[in-house]
Amino acid sequence: ELIGLVGNNGAGKTTLLRLILDLIQADDGFVESNGQKVNESGTWKEYTGSYIDGRFLIDFLTPEEYFDFIADVYHIDDETLQERLAQFEGFMHDEIMGTKKYLRDFSQGNRQKIGIIGAMIINPKVLLLDEPFNYLDPSSQMTIAHMIQRICKEQGTTVIISSHNLNFVADISSRILLLEKGKLVKDLPNADGAAIAELNEYFGIQAE
């Protein structure tokens, strides 16, 4: 399933993702992944890929070192790593690998790409991305949208993305969750982009 999280600033989209990743603790209740509470077991980390923001990167590493680090953590051999990275060559546009630059020295857009690739190369069963279209040029936005769809369809990955870009979310999501002030106010099926009219109406009313 490919789930889109939408809502105005402060609606709770990023907070929800951080709760799922056990980066913050809930005041009440708990989060389960595959039947296990994320704050009591770390097994969910083995099959979960995520990129929330630049703090997930290790700024003093080169891209090669960063991807090697991820591969070591997830026990991915070098041959497999190189095969998976090759799938992203077009997305990187020869601007990332082989540059001998540290992550801190890349543009926001290329840092975004590195973080997203790092989340995807583990072939996760669950993938969480916060504002994946931020900082990217239009062609890269289209590419990442197709990549997200592909990993969901071909690998059976459950994907949750948050975004202010309603059109992209409506284009690729099978289900859209609308949050408002920390609460779920709509759970919209989105076959063939059916939810976009209701979303446009909601946000149009909010803007008046």
Region locations from a protein language model:
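Helix-to-loop junction immediately C-terminal to a conserved catalytic motif
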Residues: 21
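Conserved ABC transporter NBD signature motif
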Residues: 29-44, 186
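Hydrophobic anchor residue at the start of the ABC signature
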Residues: 116
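A short, proline-enriched helix->beta-strand linker immediately N-terminal to the Walker B motif
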Residues: 121-125
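H-loop/switch region of ABC-family ATPase nucleotide-binding domains
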Residues: 162-164
